[in-house]
Amino acid sequence: MPATKFSRRTLLTAGSALAVLPFLRALPVQAREPRETVDIKDYPADDGIASFKQAFADGQTVVVPPGWVCENINAAITIPAGKTLRVQGAVRGNGRGRFILQDGCQVVGEQGGSLHNVTLDVRGSDCVIKGVAMSGFGPVAQIFIGGKEPQVMRNLIIDDITVTHANYAILRQGFHNQMDGARITHSRFSDLQGDAIEWNVAIHDRDILISDHVIERINCTNGKINWGIGIGLAGSTYDNSYPEDQAVKNFVVANITGSDCRQLVHVENGKHFVIRNVKAKNITPGFSKNAGIDNATIAIYGCDNFVIDNIDMTNSAGMLIGYGVVKGKYLSIPQNFKLNAIRLDNRQVAYKLRGIQISSGNTPSFVAITNVRMTRATLELHNQPQHLFLRNINVMQTSAIGPALKMHFDLRKDVRGQFMARQDTLLSLANVHAINENGQSSVDIDRINHQTVNVEAVNFSLPKRGG
């Protein structure tokens, strides 16, 4: 048998064949790259946690198909950055389970897709939660936004969700990190023990929109304190100098329809915000009786530079705009705000409810109250801002309850008198009418000591200045 001859051509041919081998070995790896969509029902049903983790490793989008129920989701599942969970069936747990959303993650509900006792835990930027129905009293919150990492999260979208029979719906704990840009819109909240939306100690956040929501039947019966509010936003410690770094700020709450709760909108230590287009009914003390919260459609505590506009209330407690108080100590007073287009009709209520109760002060400061119409309710003004304007005010309160208009400016002998403006003070009243059920003037004004007083078209007399 002739000996094998190795020519240059033979070596080149062999070398070419060897060069191809790495690419041949790589082909199976390429075949395992994530697919665009995977179906969770193609994975073992007896271990949902492991199945979801593998599904997210295999696909860009994981689908829970219609009619399919994923049970026992009782631990944390991290959705890899940029991936999507599409829920058309149901995902259920015992309250300990959660999906952690990283940068660019989406959870989308379709065809009635739902989560029960499973939390969505937002930990990244550009996250979207949309269209999903959520319920269950297992977790404290259905959607949690926070964590303890000092990071900046941007551009959160929560839209068209339904949360019912739960504790909190959306809970933001903001002390450790920042949310720059959030849109929480077009959603429905009902039958909750806690708040529909709570934005707590969110002192670093900005550009927050909360709008177009329906909130119904929030009633805390579990003994928890400060639970049971529709929408609540809070800064940190009250401070009458209103430093930016301690306030929740730069937000809008708009187009809210609410009923059957103790308090609908609540802000503590806030500034630079707008609340507008709120329609409320049956905001009464019959709800959340032991939660320790005031009864009011809108409650504002220790806030600066805000606008409340176009509020329509029926058979409800109205507004409380009051001091920032901690353990009985008065730390701040509201300043620099405008109320406009406020309507309250309590003719069908058989008992006394708050009308509009305002405490305001400081120098410099202003308060403008315009276009108010209230029936069977009282407008109460306490303490003394530097400049106070009332325009187009019509209030009626029955004599058995009290006056329709109260103006108590004189707090010189009260600890709260520390907030009274005393220099360059102005009181301006135009087209202000306060009557009882018989159309008679109904006012209680303690003292006028403003340096400038302008009065036009009012149905009552002011007391003599000074004293």
Curated annotation (Swiss-Prot):
BP-aspect Gene Ontology terms: lipopolysaccharide biosynthetic process; slime layer polysaccharide biosynthetic process
PROSITE patterns tied to this protein: TAT
Pathway(s) the chain acts in: Slime biogenesis; slime polysaccharide biosynthesis
Keyword terms of this UniProt record: Lipopolysaccharide biosynthesis
Taxonomic superkingdom: Bacteria
Gene3D superfamilies: Single-stranded right-handed beta-helix, Pectin lyase-like (2.160.20.10)
InterPro entries: Colanic_acid_synth_WcaM (IPR023882), Pectin_lyas_fold (IPR012334), Pectin_lyase_fold/virulence (IPR011050), TAT_signal (IPR006311)
Protein name listed in UniProt: Colanic acid biosynthesis protein WcaM
Organism: Salmonella typhimurium (strain LT2 / SGSC1412 / ATCC 700720)
